[in-house]
Amino acid sequence: MKVLFVAGDPKPERWTVPIKALLPEAEVHVWDANGPAVDADYAIVWQPPEQLFEREKRLKAVFNLGAGIDGLLAVPNLPPQLPIVRLEDAGMSAQMAEYVLHQLLEASRGMETYREQQRQGTWKIHRPIKRSEWPVGVMGLGHIGKRVARTLAGLDYRVNGWARSKHDLDGVSTFSGTENLTDFLQSTRVLVNTLPLTDETRDILNHKHLSQLMPNAVVINVGR
């Protein structure tokens, strides 16, 4: 079995050495733009060049180093029947949930106001926030979107979720399809986008949709 690593990492040994340790029977190669074909069975890629598919004609599957595959699908000569395997999580969902929570707290608790008061050496008490005044809407209920929604719902935030297809999540009010998008947006003050970039989602964060959010809305974009 031959494995080809094509990810543009300046230190590919960070990947190839562990792969070789886990697959001692495999030949592990690093992509060389000026080199010959290695007749790889599998390629591990991140935004691969077109030359990969011109040169490597025996590929059985491609493993994408990330959850988003839009960069891979954009390669014009990607064989249409070639199986693609993507990372569903690898710890990213927890990191994204933490990032969203951080940004939500920054906005809802007015942390920049307090930092400015700290710089000025003043102290002024502001009205405590009510979580009920900061309903969160998560666009996209894939692995990352579900993790974000569940994390915030577990902290007693009012959470809405929207996806193209129907989902059921405990503690989350879910909406599906374009026919329910307006209701979702009008019930949302903090919009969290976790959607991938596809033909269906391109430009979905537009003036028409953003203007339907609740007053003084905040957008947290962790998608494409």
What spans do the regions from the language model cover?
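Phosphate-coordination loops involved in phosphoryl transfer and adenosine-cofactor binding
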Residues: 81, 132-135, 207, 216
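Gly/Ala-rich phosphate-binding loop of Rossmann-like dinucleotide-binding domains
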Residues: 149, 153
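Rossmann-like adenosine-cofactor binding region
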Residues: 165-224
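N-terminal glycine-/charge-rich "phosphate-binding" loop or analogous flexible N-terminal tail
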Residues: 1-41
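Phosphate/diphosphate ligand-binding glycine-rich loop within oxidoreductases
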Residues: 41-115
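Glycine-rich NAD(P)-binding loop of Rossmann-like domains
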Residues: 85, 114-147, 174
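Conserved beta-strand positions in the Rossmann-like core of class I SAM-dependent methyltransferases
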Residues: 160
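Short acidic low-complexity segments
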Residues: 28-39, 50-53, 171-188
